[in-house]
Amino acid sequence: MKTDYTDISFANNGKLKLLIIVGTRPEIIRLSEVIKKCRLYFDCILAHTGQNYDYNLNGIFFRDLKLDDAEVYMDAVGADLGETVGNIIAASYKLMTSLKPDALLILGDTNSCLSAISAKRLHIPIFHMEAGNRCKDECLPEETNRRIVDIISDVNLAYSEHARRYLAECGLPKERTYVTGSPMAEVLRANLTEIKASDVLTRLKLEAGKYILLSAHREENIDTEENFTSLFTAVNKLAEKYNMPVLYSCHPRSRKRLEESGFKLDNRVIQHEPLGFHDYNKLQMSAFLVVSDSGTLPEESSFYISEGSPFPAVCIRTSTERPEALDKGDFILAGIDEKSLLQAADTAVMLKKNGDFGLPTPAYMDENVSDKVVRIIQGYTGVVNKMVWRK
């Protein structure tokens, strides 16, 4: 763990000094256009906790999304979860003490977001994107992180009115809660030319509309024996029923779990290292069926419906923190048990065949989220200092 940050400093160019902390692939993706805009208007430093340290889960996305490397790498991953969380808090505290930023921006519900605890102790205004998301499932570690970070953040930036209501139910100040919408449409629009130009189908010898795309990495799906067995039994049956390749974008932890379990996958199931942003989205656009536990699935489905490239989207979870996408019929919440998953897959395929695609989710369609975030940070840093910290 890195604890000495005396080699890092802001430019001190008279602009607001903003620290952005990330640690995982979803944060990098969602924040990519926001980071670019913040670098344009603020004195900005990007710090990476190291939570995802594999290149295919991290570095490849900096390249694809045309992001400059992070100025700070905390190397906070420990021997176990407790050590990692402790390191994130300790390292971020040292970093903030050294840098003395005017504000902190974080997104989501990862362990890296717990760096907000350090900012709170140091009276640094905290801006939290993706605030108010709730799936109401206390078994998920992300749900705990959401509650912690929402409560201690000074300004919460929600994706939807659903999320704003959840924040209000927690008693959080309405005057410091804003609905910005999801940043994903802006990210997808900025990368759409590269996505469409990807030659990933040729490289992987796949034919559009004749393969199933699978992404499964969540703790509840991989680490729970019953769910793991049910999920991959269903995957084998999908490969058999439709007699087509199932391309599995397989995280290192998931691959290790499969190897240790000895579970035999159908020979049509192809394990592949995690794909880059452009390649994965091209695969989604062109798939016969997408089966995923990714948090970005509802937003990507909504965007491609609006673009005229809908794909059958099945979410392998029992709960969702994105009810607004269910409101518009953008995906099917399938559950994890074998029977439900197979039925959901069949239904999704038939819906597309019949031209029933759902509707774009309004909360996911704004393409100026980065502008909103810049304005709110600039306007409310001083407000928080005055109203909360009495500076």
Can you name each region flagged by the protein language model?
Residues 2-7, 51-56, 75, 152-225, ...:
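A nucleotide-sugar donor-handling region in carbohydrate enzymes
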Residues 13-14, 95-102, 206-207, 286, ...:
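Glycine-rich phosphate-binding loop signature in dinucleotide/nucleotide-binding domains
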Residues 16-22, 27-34, 41, 61, ...:
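Active-site and donor-binding regions of nucleotide-sugar-utilizing enzymes
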Residues 51, 59-61, 196-286, 391:
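Donor-nucleotide binding loops and adjacent catalytic segments primarily
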Residues 74-75, 158, 179, 270-274, ...:
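Short acidic-hydrophobic, aromatic-tinged amphipathic segments that line or gate anion-handling sites
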Residues 106-107, 113-116, 128-129, 156, ...:
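A donor-sugar binding/catalytic signature common to diverse glycosyltransferases
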Residues 350-391:
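C-terminal amphipathic helix plus adjacent low-complexity
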